[in-house]
Design a protein with these regions (language model features):
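Conserved, compact domain cores that house catalytic/ligand-binding motifs in diverse enzymes
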Residues: 198-205, 210, 262-311
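SH3/SH3-like beta-barrel superfamily modules
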Residues: 201-231
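Conserved small/polar residues in nucleotide/adenosyl-binding loops
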Residues: 485-492
Length: 496
């Protein structure tokens, strides 16, 4: 019996050993898997790839804790940034004239200009040395020295190496800030298996961009944006960002100490000016007349003029101011886009406007430029208003600008900046429906109300003048076409 048992034991022993070894291997594999599962990876992310830097003269741009698609250029150890980036992300008041290679910046009182590749810039009539080239023209834009941008903008920036990156702050909001409790890592994504972007140490300061259950999205002071374990951070605190080195500009306006009751007076010939006494006598309460006297007449910036000094004298004798209207649509052969996108012709136009204001002793200038598109000359039109405003204010002349009600197609108007410079913004509260549109009201109450409320979001109430129509349209609908009859207000009753 024992001999038989011994024989069986000998046969079973190898099997038991093999089974034991298999179990041991499985246990080891399980332990290894558990260790691998819960052991953070030490793999690091290539920061050059992370910041998408492709050459040694590039630097990443991190703006308000967001990585920009734009890159800075390092030229002779100086930082340059693309004009489009400056305009869209830092300060929209910079204006690049690609036709004449000049960079302009308009303050409340001065026009500051710098020519491409020049070390100097002029402030009105004074020339200043910047020390190195301020702006360099490129094939489709321009590169501007970031130090020069900072000189006129509410921004701060710091540069870092390995890899080269610039961290810019341009929004001065409240942020969630915290400090690191213990040394840890910032990773590409939330999870210990995600590659490491940066090692952080105890007491390092970070900004919390988004809080999670276990991982928070954060930004380090040197511009690395990633994820960190929530428990590795102190309790977050609200912190209001400030820029003590920047002093906000003060804009002054020539505003009247009374409500404005303005009438646009359509004048189509020199002889029509003699009718102003009848026009005024048939109205009540008007304190500003704006005759349609001037329009852009050629591509050099010159004006056509049907104004009258007698008209102005009569209005003044009645206690009425005269704000001459200047338009861009009377002469269809003129390319207004060309005039406004070239600094030299834009300057000629402004000088012509001021010359007319002096010659006819105008109290104000009313700009009625229409059919403006962003692609053609949107930015150039805003720059035109800025530059004209400085000339007007230096000579005690009011500037008003006629604008359509806010809509998706005219967001580029930047009414808030326009209101910084112009004294009054005149809402064209009419032509809700027009020739070529569906039939409808010229100026319905809901449409006008929405236009005023939208404008108030950008323009102070005491700078708004609401232009209302004293005309209507009687629409005729036929199977093949839509037409209308244009009627003045006093003619409407007989057609109802």
């Amino acid at each position: 019996m024992s001999e038989r048992f011994s024989l069986m034991k000998k046969k079973l022993l190898p099997a038991l050993i093999v089974t034991g070894l298999i179990i041991l291997v499985v246990i080891i594999m399980g332990i290894t898997a558990l260790i691998n599962k819960y052991t953070p990876t030490k793999k690091t992310e290539d920061l050059k790839e992370y910041f998408n830097i492709s050459s040694d003269d590039e630097a990443a741009l991190i703006v308000n804790n967001e990585l920009s698609d734009y890159k800075a250029k390092i030229i002779d150890k100086k930082i340059y940034v693309d004009y489009k980036f400056v305009h869209d992300s830092l300060n929209s008041r910079f204006y690049w004239d690609a036709n004449e290679n000049v960079l302009l910046y308009t303050t409340a009182s001065d026009i500051i200009s710098a020519a491409a590749d020049s070390n100097s810039y002029s402030v009105t009539k004074q020339t200043n040395d910047f020390g190195y080239p301020i702006v360099k023209a490129t094939s489709d834009s321009a590169l501007i020295a970031l130090d020069y941008v900072k000189q006129y903008s509410n921004i701060t920036f710091k540069s870092y190496d390995d890899p080269a990156r610039i961290v810019i702050t341009s929004k001065w909001d409240e942020i969630d800030s915290a400090t690191v409790n213990k040394s840890t890592q910032v990773r590409v994504k939330g999870g210990i298996k995600s590659p490491i972007l940066k090692e952080v140490k105890k007491d390092d300061k970070i900004t919390i961009l988004d809080s999670g259950d276990k991982w928070d999205k954060v930004a380090t002071e040197d511009g690395v944006i990633g994820y960190i374990k929530s428990k590795a951070l102190s309790e977050s605190k609200k912190n209001k960002l400030t820029n003590p080195d920047y002093e906000e500009e003060t804009f002054t306006h020539i505003k009247k100490d009374k409500d404005i009751c303005l009438a646009w007076n359509q004048v189509t010939s020199q002889s029509a000016n003699s009718k102003v006494p009848q026009v005024i006598s048939s109205t009540k309460g008007i304190n500003v007349m704006s005759p349609t006297w001037f329009y852009l007449n050629d591509n050099n910036g010159n004006l056509a003029d049907i104004a009258s000094k007698d008209y102005v004298s009569y209005c003044h004798s009645q206690g009425i101011e005269v704000w001459g209207l200047f338009s861009n649509f009377e002469n269809t052969d003129v390319d207004a886009a060309y005039v406004l996108t070239h600094t030299s012709t834009r300057t000629t136009l402004i000088n012509q406007i001021m010359s007319a204001a002096f010659n006819y002793e105008l109290d104000g200038v009313n700009i009625d430029f229409e059919n403006i598109t962003e692609a053609a000359y949107g930015d150039s039109y805003i720059e035109f208003i800025r530059e004209l405003a400085i000339k007007c204010h230096n000579n005690g002349i009011s500037l008003s600008v006629d604008v359509t009600v806010p809509a998706s197609f005219n967001k580029f108007f930047n009414r808030s900046d326009m209101a910084n410079f112009a004294d009054y913004i005149v809402i064209m509260g009419y032509d809700e429906h027009y020739k070529g549109s569906d039939a409808g009201s010229v100026s319905s109450i809901p449409w006008v109300t929405e236009g005023v409320e939208s404008t108030l979001k950008e323009v102070p109430a005491d700078q708004i003048i609401l232009g209302m129509p004293f005309y209507t349209r009687i629409w005729e609908l036929t199977p093949k076409a839509v037409s209308y009859t244009h009627l003045r207000a006093h003619e409407t009753r007989s057609n109802l």
